[in-house]
Amino acid sequence: MNTAERRNEILNLLQNADAPVAARKLASQFGVSRQVIVQDMAVIRAATPGILSTTRGYV
């Protein structure tokens, strides 16, 4: 899975989630480091209004 595909999947997961999703959980699910997820989320949040970062995860 390339970066763009991973980011699209993350966005899909967040849009369908009922609760905040932790970066640690996303990292495990996609087989990447938490830092990669943090970087992905910075790009996703810049391009997608309404995505928030909380102490419990992303919503």
PLM segments and residue spans:
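Intrinsically disordered, low-complexity sequence elements enriched in Ser/Thr/Gly/Pro
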Residues: 4-5, 32, 43, 54
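Key DNA-contact positions within bacterial/archaeal DNA-binding proteins
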Residues: 35
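HTH-adjacent hinge/linker in prokaryotic transcriptional regulators
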Residues: 42-59
